[in-house]
Each structure stands twice: as structure tokens, then as C-alpha cells.
Amino acid sequence: MSEWLMLLLGTALVNNVVLVKFLGLCPFMGVSKKVDSAIGMGMATTFVLTLASALTWLIEHFLLVPFDFGYLRILSFILVIAATVQFVEMVIKKTAPDLYKVLGIYLPLITTNCAVLGVALLNAGEGAGFVRSVLYGFGSALGFTMVMVLFAGLRERLALTSVPAAFSGAPISFITAGLLSLAFMGFAGLTNH
């Protein structure tokens, strides 16, 4: 049990997909202007990333490896991720139309979010078991969501302050992201993962 907890902590805090592996930077910068939209995007990405980790593991171990179709890995993973995103988009459109409008173009862009594909490919490369792969995907998604919500909160606070003209907009956002990354380096000794 503690092994699974350490895996979740390791993927969320120590090996964060955004701050350490630099995956998912487009939604990290694009949807993080408001905390509400960051939470919605984070929840959608968490669902997609966790489900995609499970589905891509099943495809990897029951289709690609047994039939020696390794060369179709990226294509099949992208198709699975795209189908999962379409499912999530339909659910959000039906259940939360306001969130659907807020997320806008970024919801379909989860399909091309390199964090989702990157985690699926990292899982395939490690050769881990099913539960470990799903937990790795879930932990990565939790880390992605946590960092995006923290960053959105910081950006909301920065919008209320006076920032020098040379730093307003994207420059202060990148500086803030760098400082957030430095803060997460403090978790480096937490796990061995």
C-alpha cells in the first residue's frame, strides 16, 4: 500500500509532468488564467489521462506486443486518446455547458496534449503492470492538475498587482512558472521514483 502511495506522490510532486518533464505546457499556460477553468481542465485531463493509461496498457499488452505491432504504438495510442477525449467532451457538454464554454478550444486539444501521450508512452516503455500504469497516469494527472491550479491562483493574484510593463503578460507568467518549478524541486528527495 505504501508503495502505491509513494508512486502517487512521486509522480505528482517529484516527477511532475509539467515542471520536470515539460509535458502539457500548452494547456498549462493557456487555461491557467482563472482558477475555475484550471480546475475544470484539470479534472477533464485527470479523467482522460487515467482512462487513457488503462486503455493504452491493455492495447499494448493484448494487441501490440503479442502480434508484434509495436510500430503502431503511437498511432494506436493517439486514436485511443482521441476517442477518450471525444467521450469526455460529450459528457461535459451535456452535464456542464458553462464549463464546456470556458474550456473552449482547450478541451479538444487534450487529444494533442503531449502529457497524455507522453505518460502512455512512458508506461509502455517501463513495462509496468496494469495497476502501476494506471496509478502512474492518475498521479501524473493529479500533479498536472495541482500545478495548473496553483499557477492559475498565482496568475489571478498577479493580475491584481502592478507589474512593470516589460514583465506584463507572458514574461511574468514564465517567471512565475520557473519559481513554481523551483519550489517543486524541494520535493526531490521525497521518493526514489
Swiss-Prot record:
Enzyme class label: translocase
EC numbers, comma separated: 7.-.-.-
Transmembrane helix as UniProt keyword: yes
Stored InterPro entries: Ion_transpt_RnfA/RsxA (IPR011293), NqrDE/RnfAE (IPR003667), NqrDE/RnfAE_oxidrdctase (IPR050133)
Predominant subcellular localization, coarse grouping: membrane
Statement: the UniProt record of this protein carries the keyword Transmembrane: yes
TM region(s), chain numbering: 5-25, 39-59, 62-82, 102-122, 134-154, 170-190
Keyword line: Cell inner membrane, Cell membrane, Electron transport, Membrane, Translocase, Transmembrane, Transmembrane helix, Transport
Membrane topology note: Multi-pass membrane protein
UniProt superkingdom: Bacteria
Cellular component, GO, one term: plasma membrane
Gene Ontology BP term (one): electron transport chain
Subcellular location, record wording: Cell inner membrane
Assembly notes: The complex is composed of six subunits: RnfA, RnfB, RnfC, RnfD, RnfE and RnfG.
Family, similarity comment: Belongs to the NqrDE/RnfAE family.
Record's function text: Part of a membrane-bound complex that couples electron transfer with translocation of ions across the membrane.
Protein name: Ion-translocating oxidoreductase complex subunit A
Organism: Azoarcus sp. (strain BH72)
